[in-house]
Amino acid sequence: MLNTLMTHLINPLAYIVPVLLAVAFLTLIERKVLGYMQLRKGPNVVGPYGLLQPIADGVKLFIKEPVRPSTSSPFLFLAAPVLALTLAMTLWAPMPMPHPVTDLNLGILFILALSSLAVYSILGSGWASNSKYALIGALRAVAQTISYEVSLGLILLSVIIFSGGYTLQTFNTTQESIWLLIPAWPLAAMWYISTLAETNRAPFDLTEGESELVSGFNVEYAGGPFALFFLAEYANILLMNTLSAVLFLGASHIPNMPELTTINLMTKAALLSILFLWVRASYPRFRYDQLMHLVWKNFLPLTLAFVLWHTALPIALAGLPPQL
């Protein structure tokens, strides 16, 4: 009985609650970083240095009346944000930090498959809103997400060839001698740009182009349901950065200090997340055709070439004696 309780309730909660807390403070860091980069303070009234701002925001969002457009589809309108957050939380299950909640043999494929399912929540929310702006935003988001998943999948394939396994724990063993970032830096650069596009962040935030589409697919959402979308988006940002840290900046395990493993990994993920915010503060939005051109004309041929190269190299050099 206790074992079942641990597996189905306490373990997932021990993951979900810290992720939600991290998301809350990521929003605060984002506002602070953007503030200081625009030569202003950012939130600094609620609590010391604005530290309680995310709590105030959360309370404000959840006590607002959830307004629903009269012409919208009632079930789908509420199901979409719930699905978005559920997927965002489930994605954390196979992450090795240092031990995953569910030790999956195909952890990477699980993450790729579930992140593809997020498309349905976006499309559902845009369609259920029964608003032309929401629908245009949703269609843009879906096209962008699907396009960049192609390059993400191919980059993952190359990286899997490096590590020789689909489990995320193998990456720590692979990178004990050297970070994969160093031999595979073009892949790492393309991976990072693709994660920016995959999570709909600036400079690829065409789905939320305030100047054109009001707010994108979540334009009709307010209060609680909007907060769920918001949490899902930021949880995905943290997940993608943690994944980038595992894949390219791995080997967080220091043999004589195993306690530092999680701190090590999370520090890398936090630095990558701050880089996300820095990119947002620095770059203007892409034009839609440039966004698509980048992935289909630049990333796709390059990643395909890398997959071929990394597959062919060990086979071509297999006949050489190891002394060389």
Swiss-Prot record:
Keyword set, alphabetical order? Electron transport, Membrane, Mitochondrion, Mitochondrion inner membrane, NAD, Respiratory chain, Translocase, Transmembrane, Transmembrane helix, Transport, Ubiquinone
Any single GO molecular-function term of the entry would be:
NADH dehydrogenase (ubiquinone) activity
**UniProt membrane topology term:** Multi-pass membrane protein
Its Enzyme Commission number(s) read: 7.1.1.2
What is the predominant subcellular site recorded for this chain? mitochondrion
Task: State any GO BP term from the record.
Answer: aerobic respiration
Instruction: Quickly give the catalysed reaction.
Output: a ubiquinone + NADH + 5 H(+)(in) = a ubiquinol + NAD(+) + 4 H(+)(out)
> Does this entry carry the keyword Membrane?
yes
Q: Which residues cross the membrane?
A: 9-29, 75-95, 106-126, 146-166, 177-197, 228-248, 259-279, 299-319
Functional summary from the UniProt entry: Core subunit of the mitochondrial membrane respiratory chain NADH dehydrogenase (Complex I) that is believed to belong to the minimal assembly required for catalysis. Complex I functions in the transfer of electrons from NADH to the respiratory chain. The immediate electron acceptor for the enzyme is believed to be ubiquinone.
Check the record and name the HAMAP family matching this protein: NDH1_NuoH (MF_01350)
Name of the featured protein: NADH-ubiquinone oxidoreductase chain 1
- UniProt lists the gene as MT-ND1
